[in-house]
């Protein structure tokens, strides 16, 4: 295997399962790319080369022995450093968890391993998943493969950038307010935030428990679907896990591409599908090139047979305030467990228990987790709880009701993923409000718990990707994949590859075959 740039999950898995590829050769090709290119990008916090080789050899041995190597046989994946991995350091990109080696495995990573996937290492992220630019990592930022001067988005910036740069074929991520979809849009790849409870949170380090959604990244919608089929499903170890059968996500992609259902015309994979377009997601202040690309994508979906219908999500204007009240309140509770006593970083020479707590947390947490802990503690104070947190919970219900009403009129809702393309490093770091507003179009699906898929739908004149967001009803991942695959079947945006870091200054983007 000489060149794995742009190789799909299916191409690798099918090749390994058929004996045309060796998992070990594929793994070595990706490890070589990581060694050569990741110093310029910063996607990986830890590369588990020995472990990856061992896992690849096990896949090859299983096939040679006539055993099923799994649906993701030999597929090299990256793991966001928020998923605990037994025997492998897990830090959430924070100093306070430096040296923490979990004694157990997350459900998601275990399911991927059982399916034959080869984990290459742990991916960089915003500290404790708090951020929209990957500038908050205690280990340094991730750079966008399309322009090293621009952010990759966050918090799953390492995952999105690694997939875009072909440093893995797919990756895991988590999405609390847009942390899969926004970096997918900024890096020109695909990513899904499934329905809340569709994918187990067991072994996912908590930020805001009622908002955290594990999901997947891939170069295409098909890649994302293949990973999610393995990751999804009921888990008795997660009290919020939904006991519902896993959808046929890859079949939904095929239906969108081919329009094979009865009565459909070839190329009309969305015949009969109603797509809602909410005015609230196209407000003044949106980048003109972003809006133009998304409007063009909507037109393309219409040509694929979909009917575009106007819908209203009237409480969208309250989504950002509601989100940041709830997520900071939950974060202040979840992060109270990091005290220097049981695991992770511990300050030196503390003379009392109170000093141990205060100095450990002061030295171990970065600025953004401290900011959110303080905000959350404030809104949960006696006398303020009802005025802030209680009101936010009622607003959350209103937002969920908006989606429920909209889905009586349409099958899926399509919007921009972000009102802007990727911004430059440092451009918003000193202004928390502007940074938080980068999530304005992604937080509402988290508050409502509905699935949402992001994919590439164009590029700015400056060569930066633009993202499309497809939102489905609860447990409606299949309609998201069908719409996304129908769009990819009619366009080539998902095939464009960023040049390797050494050549970023010159040359047009390449197109994968």
Name what the model sees in each region.
Residues 12-18, 78, 96-101, 212-219, ...:
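Short, well-ordered beta-strand elements within core beta-sheets of diverse protein domains
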Residues 193-297, 315, 350-359, 489-512:
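A short helix-breaking turn/cap at a secondary-structure junction
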Residues 50-60, 116-117, 126:
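Long amphipathic alpha-helix in the N-terminal Rossmann-like dinucleotide-binding domain
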Residues 104-236, 446-467:
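Short glycine/serine-rich loop segments
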Residues 71-108:
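Enzymes and membrane/adaptor proteins characterized by extended Gly/Ser/Thr/Asp/Glu-rich
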Residues 19, 30, 74, 114, ...:
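Glycine-rich, small-residue loops and helix-cap segments
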Residues 1-53, 57, 299, 303-305, ...:
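An N-terminal boundary/leader segment
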Residues 37-41, 85-94, 423-425, 478:
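Cytochrome P450 core scaffold surrounding the K-helix E-X-X-R motif
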């Amino acid at each position: 295997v000489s060149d794995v740039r742009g190789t799909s999950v299916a191409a690798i898995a099918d090749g390994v399962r058929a004996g045309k590829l060796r998992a070990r050769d594929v793994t070595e090709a990706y490890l070589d790319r990581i060694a050569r290119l990741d110093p310029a990008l910063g996607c990986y916090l830890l590369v588990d080369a020995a472990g990856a080789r061992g896992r690849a050899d096990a896949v090859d041995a299983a096939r040679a022995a006539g055993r099923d190597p799994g649906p993701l046989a030999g597929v090299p994946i990256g793991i966001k450093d928020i998923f605990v991995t037994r025997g492998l350091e897990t830090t959430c990109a924070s100093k306070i968890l430096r040296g923490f080696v979990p004694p157990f495995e997350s459900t998601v990573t275990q399911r991927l391993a059982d399916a034959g996937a080869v984990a290459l290492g742990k991916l960089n992220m915003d500290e404790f998943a708090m951020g929209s630019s990957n500038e908050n990592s205690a280990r340094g930022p991730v750079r966008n493969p399309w322009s090293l001067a621009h952010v990759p988005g966050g918090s799953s910036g390492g995952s999105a950038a690694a997939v875009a740069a072909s440093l893995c074929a797919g990756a895991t991520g988590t999405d609390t307010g847009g942390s899969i979809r926004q970096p997918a849009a900024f890096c020109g790849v695909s990513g899904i935030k499934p329905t809340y409870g569709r994918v187990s949170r067991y072994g996912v380090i908590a930020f805001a428990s009622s908002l955290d959604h594990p999901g997947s990244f891939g170069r295409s919608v098909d890649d994302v679907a293949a990973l999610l089929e393995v990751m999804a499903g009921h888990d008795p170890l997660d009290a919020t896990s939904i006991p519902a059968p896993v959808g046929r996500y890859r079949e939904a992609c095929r239906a969108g591409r081919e329009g094979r259902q009865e009565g459909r015309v070839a190329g009309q994979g969305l015949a009969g599908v109603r797509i809602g377009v909410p005015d609230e997601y196209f407000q003044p202040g949106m980048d003109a090139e972003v809006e133009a690309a998304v409007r063009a994508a909507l037109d393309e979906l219409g040509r694929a047979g979909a009917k575009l219908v106007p819908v209203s999500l009237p409480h969208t204007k309250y989504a950002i305030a509601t989100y940041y009240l709830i997520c900071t309140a939950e974060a202040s509770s979840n992060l109270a467990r990091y005290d220097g006593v049981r695991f992770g970083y511990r300050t030196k020479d503390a003379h009392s228990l109170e000093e141990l707590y205060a100095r450990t947390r002061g030295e171990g947490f970065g600025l953004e987790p401290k900011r959110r802990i303080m905000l959350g503690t404030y809104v949960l104070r006696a006398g303020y709880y009802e005025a802030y947190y209680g009101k936010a919970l009622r607003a959350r219900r209103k937002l969920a009701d908006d989606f429920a009403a909209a889905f009586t009129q349409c099958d899926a809702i399509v919007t921009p993923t972000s009102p802007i393309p990727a911004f430059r490093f440092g451009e918003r770091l000193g202004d928390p409000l502007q940074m938080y507003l980068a999530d304005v179009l992604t937080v509402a699906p988290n508050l409502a718990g509905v699935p949402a898929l992001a994919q590439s739908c164009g590029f700015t004149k400056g060569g930066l990707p633009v993202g499309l967001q497809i939102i489905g009803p609860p447990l409606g991942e299949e309609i998201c994949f069908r719409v996304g695959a129908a769009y990819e079947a009619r366009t080539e945006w998902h095939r464009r590859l960023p040049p390797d870091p050494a050549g970023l200054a010159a040359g047009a983007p390449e197109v994968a075959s």
